[in-house]
């Protein structure tokens, strides 16, 4: 089995207007590379998934449309709970977790899932990814105490909003 991996960081530089031109260019370049790889290795079915950056970007639908027109790939944009579900399925195939939580920390978002009897019970996607928090709250390197406090408050605020999450 061949494996290709590329870190794109679509969220980097995202503003209220959406994904930046440079981020979209990185995305297009990577998707073209993956498409060429799939075509050259005889892959019949491609199931491309877009997650938090595209889901949350004001111009996410434009990005999806351009990918379809320019590259010939139909991106599926996952909702946050669905993303948490797929993270859980992947985790349960790797670890013997019976009850507990699965947490996937990405650049843009964090998916957290409740697992009972080795089954997905509930999930949520939070805008608590490392890049999202840094771009929102941190201007200094290293971060100031005030910036760290703001990040901690945002994490607590978003976690408190999940009704099924234990205290």
Residue ranges and their predicted role:
Residues 1-105, 113-167:
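Nucleotide/phosphate-binding catalytic cleft detector across ATP-hydrolyzing
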Residues 108:
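Conserved Rossmann-like nucleotide-cofactor binding loop
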């Amino acid at each position: 089995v061949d494996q290709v991996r590329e870190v794109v960081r679509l969220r980097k530089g995202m503003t209220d207007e959406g994904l930046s031109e440079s981020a979209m260019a990185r995305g297009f370049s990577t998707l073209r590379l993956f498409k060429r790889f799939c075509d050259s290795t005889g892959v019949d079915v491609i199931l491309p998934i877009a997650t938090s950056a595209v889901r949350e970007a004001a111009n996410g639908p434009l990005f999806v449309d351009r990918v379809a027109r320019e590259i010939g790939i139909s991106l599926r944009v996952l909702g946050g709970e669905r993303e948490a579900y797929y993270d859980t399925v992947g985790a349960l195939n790797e670890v013997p977790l019976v009850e507990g939580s699965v947490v996937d920390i990405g650049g843009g978002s964090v998916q957290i899932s409740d697992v009972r009897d080795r089954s997905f019970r509930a999930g949520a996607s939070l805008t608590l990814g490392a890049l999202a928090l840094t771009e929102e709250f941190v201007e200094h390197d290293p971060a100031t105490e005030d910036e760290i406090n703001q990040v901690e408050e945002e994490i607590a605020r978003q976690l408190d909003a999940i009704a099924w999450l234990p205290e």
